[in-house]
């Protein structure tokens, strides 16, 4: 936009994908560098992918980091080079230097994680299932016990957070996801999975799914995701299902066991905002609307009868 007149000068991106954070603007070379999600077929729509756009040409977007992984890029002051560290939850970080065109010109040192593996640590696994509509793809991560035995059957616990700003579903490699990893070592399959309404990273329709529904929008997707995983993997015991979360996850876990008491066996709710009508009106009205018909109050009364 022209800052003096407010008039649109150029539309830099277009299409059914999401343009994310701007990392750098080259005012001399007339280029903008930014992360995007969901543009490339076959690449996880949650991965941070770096693009270059021309400030003076509409929709002149160039992919700079093509690997199917989440990228963290630092661009040099001269814009001639960039350092890229990319990974997935199960792929160790790869650190490279690229030229301005995205071509890898040097591979930097790799981390030595052999001592961690020798201690019994295992990377989690990313999975994909369908939402309760049977159409929308949902993405999640699964942790297993270090002594996992595929011939045994394990209870499953879902670590939840309803959004709407982000989904607590890791995309990058780490050995420090302590809560899920520790819980798995107690003999559980632990998952966290995204759901409709959880994040703007999947586009407007996905993000706005929870509008006019302050509480129930994520519940059916979590339940259906677990049912699909149990049907896919015989080592999951679908009769022993737990759910837990903090803050929004606290309200979601409590709402889930009250809504589906015959499905969830146990729930742990930490610091839940159980009535969004009286919690932080600013973000609630922006993302969920105004509860003019007291829908939340009526549904709360109905579901609490399941206690």
Language-model features, listed with the residues they occupy:
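Serine-hydrolase catalytic core recognition
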Residues: 29, 72-302
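Hydrophobic beta-strand positions in blades of beta-propellers and related beta-sheet-rich domains
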Residues: 1, 48-52, 95-97, 140
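Generic short beta-strand segments
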Residues: 35-36, 143
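Short, solvent-exposed loop/turn segments at conserved positions within beta-propeller repeat blades
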Residues: 41-46, 88-91
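Multi-bladed beta-propeller domains
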Residues: 1-28, 37-42, 53-71, 100-130
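Extracytoplasmic/periplasmic beta-strand context in beta-sandwich domains
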Residues: 10, 48-49, 93, 204
């Amino acid at each position: 936009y022209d800052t003096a007149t407010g008039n649109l000068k150029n539309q830099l991106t277009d299409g059914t994908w999401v343009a994310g954070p701007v990392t750098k603007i080259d005012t001399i070379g007339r280029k903008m560098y930014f992360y995007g999600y969901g543009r490339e077929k076959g690449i996880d729509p949650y991965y941070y992918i770096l693009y270059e756009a021309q400030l003076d040409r509409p929709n002149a977007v160039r992919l700079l980091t093509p690997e199917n992984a989440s990228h963290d890029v630092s661009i040099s002051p001269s814009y001639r080079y960039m350092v890229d560290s990319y990974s997935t939850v199960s792929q160790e970080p790869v650190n490279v230097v690229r030229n301005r065109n995205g071509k890898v010109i040097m591979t930097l040192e790799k981390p030595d994680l052999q001592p961690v593996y020798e201690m019994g640590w295992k990377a989690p696994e990313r999975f994909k299932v369908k939402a309760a509509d049977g159409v929308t793809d949902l993405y999640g991560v699964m942790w297993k016990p270090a002594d996992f035995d595929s011939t045994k059957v394990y209870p499953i616990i879902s670590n939840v957070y309803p959004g709407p700003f982000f989904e607590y579903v890791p995309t990058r490699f780490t050995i420090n996801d302590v809560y899920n990893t520790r819980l798995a070592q107690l003999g559980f399959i632990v998952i966290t999975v995204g759901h409709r309404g959880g994040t703007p990273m999947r586009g407007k329709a996905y993000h706005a799914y929870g509008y006019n529904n302050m509480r129930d929008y994520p519940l059916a997707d979590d339940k259906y995701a677990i049912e699909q995983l149990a049907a896919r993997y015989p080592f999951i015991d679908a009769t022993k299902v737990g759910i837990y979360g903090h803050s929004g996850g606290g309200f979601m876990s409590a709402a889930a066991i009250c809504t589906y008491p015959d499905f969830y066996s146990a729930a742990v709710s930490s610091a839940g905002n159980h009535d969004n009508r009286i919690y932080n009106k600013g973000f609630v009205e922006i993302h969920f609307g105004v509860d003019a018909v007291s829908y939340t109050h009526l549904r709360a009364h109905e579901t609490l009868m399941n206690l």
